[in-house]
Amino acid sequence: TDYYWYGDKNRMTIKESVTGEDNQIKNSQADSYRNNRNSLVASKLVLGFPLFKGELSVGGEYSSLNRRMLYTIVPEVTSNENEKVKESMTSAFVDYTRSFGALSVQAGLRYEYNDFDYYTNEIRIDLQSKTYSNWFPSLALSLPVGKTQMQLTYAADIYRPSYNELRSGVQYDNQYTYESGNPFLTPSITRNLTYAFSWKWVNLQLICSHISDEVCTMTQSYQNNPIKSLARPENINSYNSFQAGLT
């Protein structure tokens, strides 16, 4: 079991001089302060033993995180932030490896349960608090054929939005540029089917992927003002991709 604590404080002064249509110079200054604090407790257990001429591994992980996010700016050109996140994640996995002649097989299954509570000004926001339950199977087949080596794998992984991406407040960069998080983001899951072939110095790799709910930063007008832009992460529609590489 491990315990981790991390804090980050950042003060920033933004001074701007803008020449208006009347050729008059307008000076402005904004002073911001951000204070993030994190505490994490994590534990992991893995057991391995032989089974049916192969090797079986089973295990589990648990983590609990508390994060506090404070942001103030003077003058108050955007709203101040007082946000808190409480998150716990529990996972269990099983993995089995065995050879059948020249064929090597590795199969696994992982389960993850995530409980995410979101608070603004010490009030839990039910709409932005979520639970997730995911299964991630995996399979790898490796086979040497003469002087060649072939491998076929299937695996799935998950990208969970960072806490910075999940914040609800708006950060002031300058009078024309703002950025924010999006507490309604959902995790993105990528499922990959990969074929690899190698012969002497030649390596071929083909990857077919299905990406669900990828997180991308989108830019839009801020407060219906076309000269002000807001950068905000969003989930985009699911899509398929194909990659090929030859070296």
Regions found by a protein language model. Name each.
Residues 1, 58-60, 107-109, 139, ...:
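Membrane-embedded beta-strand positions of outer-membrane beta-barrel proteins
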Residues 1-120, 144, 148-149, 240-247:
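Face-selective signature of the C-terminal outer-membrane beta-barrel domain
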Residues 9-24, 68-77, 117-125, 163-171, ...:
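Outer-membrane beta-barrel translocator domains and adjoining extracellular loop/strand segments
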Residues 23-31, 74-80, 89, 119-125, ...:
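Extracytoplasmic loops and strand-loop junctions of Gram-negative outer membrane beta-barrel proteins
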Residues 36, 84-87, 127-130, 158-212, ...:
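Outer-membrane beta-barrel signature, preferentially recognizing the C-terminal barrel domain
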Residues 41, 50, 118, 135, ...:
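Outer-membrane beta-barrel channel domains
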Residues 49-53, 97-102, 135, 140-147, ...:
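Outer-membrane beta-barrel strand-turn architecture
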Residues 109-114, 155-158, 169-171:
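Active/binding-pocket-proximal capping segment
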